[in-house]
């Protein structure tokens, strides 16, 4: 995995994604969001990348519980078969309820999440990418 300047075009706001919190279920976004029970799922970010030298993308969704509690982000890595996104790996990561901002980025071999907390240093979480594209 490596960062890239641009990513292949895809309709990220209107597609079906894996939901790693629901035992293999999926969630379908329409215009960038979906309602699952009382929860809301939103497209948060898309990051251009390359995987094994080919175009790829990292997509981040945020699931906000309707009954309160901390949100969870799903980070998913896609490669492309021609112009079609093919999912490789997905991971669910809880959001720190005290974070005022979250920024995702791609570095060689990993996806990074930087959380900004008031009065504290930023917290950086690193999610490694295995050879098959799954996330560690």
Predicted features by range, described:
Residues 72-75, 122:
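Repetitive beta-architecture junctions, highlighting loop-to-beta-strand starts
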Residues 74-81, 128-129:
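Beta-propeller blade signature
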Residues 19-38, 93-95:
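Surface-exposed loop and turn segments in beta-propeller and other repeat-based domains
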Residues 63-67, 117-120:
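Short glycine/acidic-enriched loop and turn motifs that connect beta-strands
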Residues 39-52, 100-109:
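Beta-propeller blade termini
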Residues 86-94, 136:
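Beta-propeller fold detector
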Residues 50-61, 110-112:
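Acidic/hydrophobic-patterned starts of short beta strands in beta-sheet-rich repeat architectures
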Residues 1-25, 98-136:
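Acidic, small-residue rich beta-repeat scaffolds with periodic aromatic anchors
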């Amino acid at each position: 995995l490596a960062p890239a300047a641009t990513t292949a075009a895809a309709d990220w706001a209107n597609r079906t994604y894996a939901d790693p919190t629901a035992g293999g279920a999926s969630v379908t976004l329409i215009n960038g969001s979906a309602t699952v029970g009382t929860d809301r799922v939103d497209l948060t970010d898309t990051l251009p990348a390359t995987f094994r030298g080919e175009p790829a993308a990292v997509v981040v969704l945020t699931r906000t519980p309707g009954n309160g509690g901390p949100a969870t982000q799903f980070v998913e890595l896609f490669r492309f078969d021609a112009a079609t996104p093919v999912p490789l790996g997905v991971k669910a990561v809880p959001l720190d309820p005290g974070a005022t901002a979250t920024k995702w980025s791609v570095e060689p071999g990993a996806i990074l999440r930087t959380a900004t907390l008031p009065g504290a240093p930023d917290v950086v979480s690193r999610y490694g990418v295995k050879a098959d594209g799954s996330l560690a």
